[in-house]
Structures are given as C-alpha cells and as structure tokens.
C-alpha cells in the first residue's frame, strides 16, 4: 500500500524570499511532496486520507553546511562519511561541504575528489579542493583542474596561506567564480591560546588568544578583496566583535561565515565546559557573540556553518590543550539555534533559514534548496519536542566530542525526506 500523509494544518516555508504559510497543507507520498494547499486537501480527500494536525510544526527546505571536517571518511573508529551523512540528514541537512584535511585527505588533485557521493544517499557532499600543496602555503595546487573536476571551491581548511601566495592565486584567477574560503587566523599570533583574551579567559586560567590573531589577517584579506573584486574571497569562521566592526567599514566586503557554536555560546557561559570551550577560532565573550548575531541579522555574515571537527573516544582522552580543537553534532544545530535566535532573540523562521540554508547555498554557488512537487528534499521541524541526544541513537553522529549529548534539547527534526544509508540496526 502506498503511504500517504496529509499534514493539515502545518506551517510551510517554500523557499527563499517566501514567507511562512501559517495554515498550510502538504500531501506526502512515499516521502515525496505530492501537493500543497487546497490541491493537497482535495487529493487526500479523493484518496480517503485523513489529516494529521501539525500546526506548530514547520515544513521547510533542507539545511546546507558550508564547511566541516571529516578526518577519516572511509574508515576509522569514529565518524565516517556514512555516519556523518546519516546524522546530518537526521538534523535536516541536505548538503555538506567538506574541507581538505591535514592528513591524507588533502584533495590536491582531481582524482582525490572521487568516492564521496553515495548512490544510496541524497545528501549532496561537496568537496573543497586544497588551496596549497600539503596545506603548507608554499606552492599552489592546480586550481583550474580541481574546479573543473567538481571542487566546490578552494581552501586550506583551518590554515591561512601567506598573503603573497593568496595574492598570486587571486591574480591568476584559476578559481574563476568559485569561492576561496580562508580563515582570518594568524596561527603564530594565536600561539597556544585557547580562549579569546579577556577577563573570562583569565579567570578560567587557560592560555589566551589575542584579538590581533583575527583582526590582522582580516585586514589583510579585506585588502586582497579590494584588489581583486572579481574574486569570491570568503572569510571562514568570523569570531570577534572587532572583526564584525571591521567588515562594517568596508565598501567591498568579502563573504563571511560563522560557526554555530560561536552564535550559541561564549566563554562567559556558565554552561561552558572544557570540552566545548576549545574550538577554532577561539571562543570569545558575550560581546563577541552579540556582535556575531548582529552581523548575521544585518547580512554582514551570510552563513552559519556547523564546522564539525569530529574526534573519536581515544582522542577525547587527551587533555583539552593537547588535542585537536573542535566539536561536532549536526543534529543539535537547528534545535539550539531555534531556541537562541527565534525564541530568545525574536528572529523569524525566514531569517533563520536564510543563514542556515539559502545563504549557505548562495555562498557555495549552488541552487538554493526549495520545496517542490515530486521532491524528497524537505524537513519537518517540531520546536516543542523535548529530547535527549545520545550516542546510542542509530541516527546519531559517532563523534565523541558532541557538547549537547545527554542533556535535554527543545526542538527536533522529526522527519526528513532525503534518503540516507540504512542504520546498522536496520
């Protein structure tokens, strides 16, 4: 028997530049969108299908993650490509863009871009091609060949190449109109700093990261954008109020992203723990967080990235200052940001989707997600569901460094239409 479900009423957000329909209706057949509104009601009536009330839930396009890391995509004890796309889809993500890694996944040549798109999965996996050979910032990779082979853009991950090499690449222009994703981060200035400098960091007793480790490279990248206005330079992971202020002063601004954790919390938070404090870029204080949210609302920052950096159990046994920085957990992003931005800060659903889906698509240069008849690219979000994420959930990420584990979360993606690899228990 063909499975049909009529959601009526349900809140519906069709796509960018659309407003939420507060009393909409949608007919689903075998996981695909069959019809909307009165057409959906009439088709359900003709088929003898009753309605399922979902007036508080939101039917919306899938989310898009601009950048995340995956050190061991095809093997390993922790997160793999299979577990990542499964958990990302459970969190409503229909597209992921993976950064090149410092390990064996540099993706410096076209043949390293193969094998990431599974035939049994509708989560689109985009790949950032390596900007420099070995990520060393000395020699350029074959940019044109990488773009032609399907790289979504170019990046050296968490490393910022030297300015002369960046200038050379932008002058050569082999990236064309594809984004060049660079973190405004001076690793030398940051040194061993773990938290952004300030009273909270001093009270915590951890090494501090000076503000200049972001503002100095940000000024350099801003100048490069002025000199190469035809290039799509993109700032990865803005993290300070000073950085937002600098962007405001520019007449020609590079695009910018921010990680969800910097929007959600700060080093001032009493809920912060050692495990969730240490991310890249360094976590700032309440002023930084407020400025980042303002930058998003004003369009200075176009995308909230997950920037997942999964660790396995063994890696998490190391002291926080001796292991790779970062957190993971695609399933936790939408519920957390809904509470922070919609419930607490008065954002609309349209605003939230612009920075979690439509803006990220535009930044990547791909078609924006949109609800359409015959498509399975949709999610159903219930903001009132209270649940506790656990690693035993077959849809959960396999990363050990998920800061929202084992604590109640409000809001959850209760259904998502896109296909993913079957769970091991299925």
Place the predicted regions along the sequence by residue.
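Divalent metal-coordination and catalytic microenvironments
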Residues: 10, 26, 31, 56, ...
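Alpha-helix-loop-beta-strand connector modules within alpha/beta enzyme cores
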Residues: 109-128, 172-185, 332-336
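His/Asp/Glu-enriched, well-ordered alpha-helical/loop segment
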Residues: 203-230, 297-298, 303, 309-381
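N-terminal metal-binding scaffold of metallo-dependent hydrolase/deaminase domains
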Residues: 1-45, 421-422
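Metal-associated gating/positioning segment near the N- to mid-region
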Residues: 41-42, 54-117
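Histidine/acidic residue-rich metal-binding segments in metalloenzymes
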Residues: 140-304
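C-terminal cap of metal-dependent C-N hydrolases
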Residues: 375-426
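Active-site mouth loops of central-metabolism enzymes
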Residues: 66-79, 126-139, 158, 207
